Amino acid sequence: MPNNYKEMKVGQIQTLKVARISDFGLYLSDEEGQEVLLPNRFVSLTNAIGDEIEVFVYHDSEDRLVATTDRPLITEGRVASLKVVDKNIHGAFLDWGISGKDLFLPNRNQQGGVLAGRSYVVWLYVDNITGRCVATMKLKPFIDNDIITVKPRQKVDILIASESPIGYRAIINSRHWGMIYKNQIFRPVRVGDSLEGWVRRITDDNRID
């Protein structure tokens, strides 16, 4: 398989330049000269050769590398709470905000199975062999507190991952685990919520509150 997915940064939002126009849409080019199609349904009448367009690159339902101006709910190397919209014997399919294409969550990447209509916290990665975007519920390889990249009083992105008697376990900046104690919560929250917060303290053993 050609390595276009590596050059085009599959799974990420990026700015590409209009290289040429076809009957099917616009061909967008990156700095390496790699091209990807932006289908007509995402093309504006004002787009012209040389214009720069912010797009998300992925494989469509026919396994073609394409671009879209849709804004995904998750990108490569990030976590999000996504709803299961369908299932089959191979896995589940998640709504990730891309029209006409659901995000695949293979059975091997699930923990305890999933139910249609329920939302689950997942990480998005690009498969090294196929170049496709894939979801996983197994977060341990990606979320850790070995090397802390935040500091006290820093503003951070928070995803509520689970609830305990003392508070909520949260994922910070899609990188670290943290704890929000119930006496530090001043608004209703539930598992799957994304919000902004601040780091209160970091303990000697790298626990983040």
Predicted regions and their residues:
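Single-stranded RNA-binding regions, centering on S1/OB-family and related RNA-binding modules
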Residues: M1-D209
